[in-house]
């Protein structure tokens, strides 16, 4: 049996790309031939379909015409352009003809590229390829997609997002309920999983160079924000919390952290962001806000990738986890939470906002985190939580930083929970 995993991109550090690699490995462990298919392959081997890349010009034009404004186009012209794009994508799929199964990641659910959804569905139908829709996010969850501009795009959303006659997989129980309520479709829940048996992420002779690359002392404290840089990640909440930590750090001069860093007059605190920067205006907002709050941001995407490239001094995302003292994960909305699983494996304490899926599917399992609560307001382009939550989180962070035995017990218990609840072998049971 030959299986294709398709998405707009792979070989990056975003959640869908990372999860596709896990599925590929799990399927190959079951002795199934498995291939990655994407518009942009990043560092991964596989089949490239350029027309479905996030950066494709026609994709972005039609996305704007579909959900923002038709402008000078009328509906007939829109339909003509959309159909031509569908045909072009269809024709690029010819190398996939021998597949038995196509696992379609987010293309049938998020509506970033409606033409890709139609083309892939028709191609699979025409060639007898079974389809599994792996839905990480739904278009109705995002404000951008809530106002289609014409009847043709409404028809496409109704028929192909997602198609009714395929197998559906979602990554949390809230998504399962929504898909049933909105579309009348049943689905299987397979949460994000993780290979807890892989080699530990530890500081070594290579990743220790990150300190010099970012002009950080090995004695400084590093808070790691490992997500992409987009608004729903609410990185401003990490800035708020780090600002409070930095403000009170001098009270702890002379103390030693759980990982052996002695706090001195010169100890600094950094918020390091190695993730993809996908909203340039938001990056500027964060820079300005961090400056106001006296927090030093280190944007590290230029030296980060999904795997190491030692000849170019590029580090993997896991290298950044190895040097982190604390993980920040204040996302307002997540399909599941890859960074949460990564923090568990890294045995690094995590600060997080309790987004809906975390509250529903993860928190009841017994994980312990430093919480920013579950209520946030969006005002003037940024998310806010009650200042009392920030102060409470700061106090818990200091308690963890200077209690090595307590952290050891906590991280060991949480790691064991993670191994038992979200292992790669969960795949075989689903």
UniProtKB/Swiss-Prot annotation:
The protein's enzyme class: transferase
Cofactor(s) annotated in UniProt: a divalent metal cation
Keywords: Glycosyltransferase, Transferase
Annotated EC: 2.4.1.-
GO molecular function: glycosyltransferase activity
Keyword Glycosyltransferase: yes
Family label: Belongs to the glycosyltransferase group 1 family.
Protein name in the entry: Mannosylglucosylglycerate synthase
Species whose genome carries this gene: Petrotoga mobilis (strain DSM 10674 / SJ95)
Taxonomic path: Bacteria, Thermotogati, Thermotogota, Thermotogae, Petrotogales
């Amino acid at each position: 049996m030959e299986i294709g995993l398709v998405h707009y991109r792979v070989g990056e550090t975003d959640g869908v790309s990372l999860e596709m690699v896990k599925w590929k490995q799990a399927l190959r462990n079951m002795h199934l031939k498995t291939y990655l298919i994407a518009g942009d392959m990043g560092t991964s081997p596989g089949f490239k379909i350029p027309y479905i890349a996030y950066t494709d010009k026609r994709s972005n034009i039609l996305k704007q015409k579909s959900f923002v404004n038709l402008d000078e186009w009328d509906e007939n012209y829109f339909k003509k352009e959309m159909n031509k794009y569908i045909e072009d994508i269809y024709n690029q799929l010819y190398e996939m003809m021998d597949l038995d199964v196509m696992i379609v990641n987010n293309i049938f659910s998020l509506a970033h590229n409606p033409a890709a959804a139609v083309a892939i569905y028709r191609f699979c139908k025409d060639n007898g390829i079974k389809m599994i829709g792996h839905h990480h996010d739904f278009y109705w969850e995002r404000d951008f997609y809530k106002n289609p501009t014409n009847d043709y795009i409404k028809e496409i959303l109704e028929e192909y997002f997602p198609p009714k006659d395929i197998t559906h997989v979602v990554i949390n129980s809230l998504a399962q309920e929504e898909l049933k309520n909105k579309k009348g479709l049943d689905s299987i829940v397979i949460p994000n999983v993780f290979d807890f048996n892989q080699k530990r992420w530890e500081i070594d002779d290579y990743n220790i160079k990150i300190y010099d690359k970012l002009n950080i002392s090995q004695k400084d404290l590093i808070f790691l924000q490992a997500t992409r840089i987009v608004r729903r990640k609410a990185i401003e909440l990490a800035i708020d919390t780090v600002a409070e930590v930095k403000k009170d750090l001098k009270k702890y001069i002379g103390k030693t952290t759980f990982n052996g860093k002695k706090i001195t007059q010169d100890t600094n605190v950094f918020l390091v962001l190695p993730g993809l920067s996908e909203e340039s205006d938001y990056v500027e907002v964060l820079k300005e806000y961090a400056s106001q709050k006296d927090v030093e941001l280190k944007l590290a995407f230029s030296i980060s990738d999904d795997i190491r490239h030692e000849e170019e001094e590029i580090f993997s995302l896991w290298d950044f986890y190895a040097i982190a003292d604390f993980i920040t994960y204040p996302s307002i909305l997540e399909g599941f939470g890859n960074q949460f699983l990564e923090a568990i494996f890294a045995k690094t304490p995590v600060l997080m906002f309790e987004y809906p899926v975390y509250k529903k599917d993860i928190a009841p399992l017994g994980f312990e985190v430093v919480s920013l609560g579950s209520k946030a307001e969006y005002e003037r382009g940024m998310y806010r939580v009650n200042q009392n939550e920030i102060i409470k989180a700061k106090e818990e962070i200091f308690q963890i930083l200077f209690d090595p035995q307590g952290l050891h017990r906590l991280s060991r218990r949480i790691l064991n929970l993670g191994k038992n609840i979200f292992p790669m072998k969960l795949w075989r049971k689903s």
